[in-house]
């Protein structure tokens, strides 16, 4: 039996995935979490084989939660299930310790296949995302996102900023000083040739890394 933890801040999304999996032989949803912090705690105290993880959630978010789970509970396999398919996110997520990467638009059977694949020790990346990643290696000048130059930590902080989180919130959630968070911010601004959080969010929207609704919280 493959024990699965569902992690998403939208209850409706979790309910939908649970319905998909509840009749699948050999797969059991053993728990749910609505934020990265709870997902990390769940994996440390319960028997979990595979985590279906959302990227953008309140708190530390899916990227940092993936890193923490991969470090502390190496046997747990993580599949990032997200609307964000733009380079460089898939590669950064896999580097953080995920075993799989799927779009939330994936067919139910592909979700099942991904769970079984990562449980058996393989990696699973949706074919369209894998093609995009391969193309970026062949023709980087045509496919590379401006965000490809960001480090994993910079990318993580960028996603938190585009959700409207402030420096003090980010520093508390990531156990970094506000000064360190600001250093990452200004480094990002320099790399991306921008001058502030709103401009960062506009750029992220243009490249599919967040949606326009986030601007209302800026």
From Swiss-Prot:
Gene3D superfamilies: 3.40.50.2300. Residues 3-119 form the Response regulatory domain. CDD domains: LuxR_C_like (cd06170), REC_NarL-like (cd17535). It comes from the Bacteria. NCBIfam families: PRK09483.1. The modification 4-aspartylphosphate is found at residue 54. Disulfide bonds: none annotated. Member of the two-component regulatory system UvrY/BarA involved in the regulation of carbon metabolism via the CsrA/CsrB regulatory system. UvrY activates the transcription of the untranslated csrB RNA and of barA, in an autoregulatory loop. Mediates the effects of CsrA on csrB RNA by BarA-dependent and BarA-independent mechanisms. The keyword Cell inner membrane does not apply. GO terms for biological process: phosphorelay signal transduction system; regulation of DNA-templated transcription. Residues 143-208 form the HTH luxR-type domain. This is Response regulator UvrY. Residues 167-186 bind DNA. It comes from Escherichia coli (strain K12). Disruption phenotype: Inactivation of the gene leads to hydrogen peroxide hypersensitivity. It is found in: Cytoplasm. Induction: Expression is regulated by SidA. One of its GO terms (cellular component) is cytoplasm. It holds the Pfam family GerE. Phosphorylated and activated by BarA. Keywords: Cytoplasm, DNA-binding, Phosphoprotein, Transcription, Transcription regulation, Two-component regulatory system. InterPro entries: CheY-like_superfamily (IPR011006), Sig_transdc_resp-reg_C-effctor (IPR016032), Sig_transdc_resp-reg_receiver (IPR001789), Tscrpt_reg_LuxR_C (IPR000792), WalR-like (IPR039420). GO terms for molecular function: DNA binding; phosphorelay response regulator activity.
């Amino acid at each position: 039996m493959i024990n699965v933890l569902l992690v998403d801040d939208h209850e409706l999304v979790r309910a939908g995935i649970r319905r998909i999996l509840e009749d699948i032989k050999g797969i059991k949803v053993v728990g749910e979490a609505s934020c990265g912090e709870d997902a990390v705690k769940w994996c440390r105290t319960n028997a979990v084989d595979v985590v279906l993880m959302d990227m953008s959630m309140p708190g530390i978010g899916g990227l940092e939660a993936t890193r923490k789970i991969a470090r502390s509970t190496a046997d747990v396999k993580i599949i990032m299930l997200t609307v964000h398919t733009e380079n460089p996110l898939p590669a950064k997520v896999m580097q953080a310790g995920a075993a799989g990467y799927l779009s939330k638009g994936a067919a139910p059977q592909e979700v099942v296949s991904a769970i079984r694949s990562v449980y058996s020790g393989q990696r699973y990346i949706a074919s369209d995302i894998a093609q995009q990643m391969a193309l970026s290696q062949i023709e980087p000048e045509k496919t590379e996102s401006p965000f490809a130059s960001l480090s994993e930590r910079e990318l993580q902080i960028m996603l938190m900023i585009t959700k409207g989180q402030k420096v003090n919130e980010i520093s508390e959630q990531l156990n970094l000083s506000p000064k360190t968070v600001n250093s990452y911010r200004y480094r990002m601004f320099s790399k991306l040739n921008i001058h502030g959080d709103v401009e960062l969010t506009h750029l992220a929207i243009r490249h599919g890394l967040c949606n326009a609704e986030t601007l209302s919280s800026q």
